[in-house]
Design a protein with these regions (language model features):
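Mixed-charge, glycine-accented linear interaction segment located at domain edges/termini
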Residues: 145-194
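Short acidic (Asp/Glu) patches
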Residues: 55-68
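Phosphate/anion-contacting hairpin/loop surfaces
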Residues: 121-145
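Oligomerization/assembly interface segments of phage tail-like spikes and tubes
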Residues: 67-92, 167-183
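Polar/acidic, low-complexity leader/linker segments enriched in S/T/G and N/D
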Residues: 1-43, 194
Length: 194
C-alpha cells in the first residue's frame, strides 16, 4: 500500500453556519438515518466549542530502568458549549422543561411614570431557573451547507448569562458532554453527489 500524501488527507470541517438541535438521539452505527431538528439555535459567534481534554497517563516503572515499563491512559473528557442570545419561550422550554416556563398575561407597574404605567400592562414569560438535562443531537452545518458535524448522545445544561449588560443581550450558555460511552457519538458528513 502506497503512502498517503498530504493532499489526500485533506478533509476539513470549518466555518459553522448554523446549529440545529433535535430532541431525538441519533444512532450513528446505522448506515442510513433520518434526523428531524426541533430548533435552529441562534448561536453567538465564536462561542461554539467541541473539545476533548488531553488523556491522563499512568506510568508504571520498575527498579533499574529509567523509562516506563508500561503506560496506560484514560481518555480525556469531551465537552460541548455554546451561547444562545435569546429568551424565546420555545428555547426556555427546551433549556429548562415545560413545567419551568409560564405565561404572564398582564403585569401593571405603578411608578408615576406614564410611559411605564401603561394601562395595557406588560405581558411575557416567567421562568423557574432549575437544573434540567438537555438531551439529544446537535447538527452543525458549515457555511457552504455541504458538510455537517453531528454530535449525539449529548447531555447539556443551560445557565443564564448577562454580564455585559450594556453591549450584549440576555443569553444562555449551554455546556455539557457526551454520554455515549461505547457508542458512535460524532460524525462528519458531506453532501452526496447527485
Amino acid at each position: 500500500m502506497a503512502m498517503k500524501k498530504i493532499e489526500e488527507l485533506k478533509d476539513n470541517f470549518v466555518g459553522p453556519r448554523t446549529l440545529l438541535y433535535a430532541k431525538a438521539i441519533a444512532d450513528l452505527s446505522k448506515a442510513t438515518l433520518d434526523i428531524t431538528p426541533d430548533l435552529e439555535l441562534p448561536v453567538e459567534v465564536d462561542s461554539l466549542k467541541a473539545t476533548m481534554e488531553d488523556p491522563t497517563f499512568n506510568h508504571y516503572k520498575v527498579i533499574g530502568l529509567a523509562g516506563d515499563w508500561a503506560t496506560t491512559s484514560e481518555l480525556g473528557d469531551f465537552s460541548v458549549e455554546f451561547v444562545v442570545p435569546s429568551k424565546a419561550k420555545d428555547l426556555l422550554i427546551a433549556m429548562f422543561g415545560a413545567d419551568a416556563v409560564g405565561d404572564l398575561t398582564k403585569l401593571t407597574l405603578k411608578t408615576g411614570d406614564t410611559d411605564l404605567d401603561a394601562t395595557t400592562g406588560f405581558t411575557g414569560t416567567a421562568l423557574e431557573l432549575k437544573k434540567f438535562k438537555i438531551q439529544g443531537t446537535i447538527i452543525i452545518v458549515d457555511e457552504t451547507k455541504t458538510n455537517l458535524m453531528v454530535i449525539t448522545n449529548i447531555a447539556l445544561y443551560a445557565t443564564m448569562q448577562w454580564d455585559e449588560t450594556g453591549t450584549k443581550p440576555v443569553a444562555f450558555k449551554f455546556s455539557g458532554s457526551v454520554e455515549g460511552a461505547g457508542k458512535k457519538s460524532i460524525a462528519w458528513l458531506s453532501k452526496a453527489a447527485a
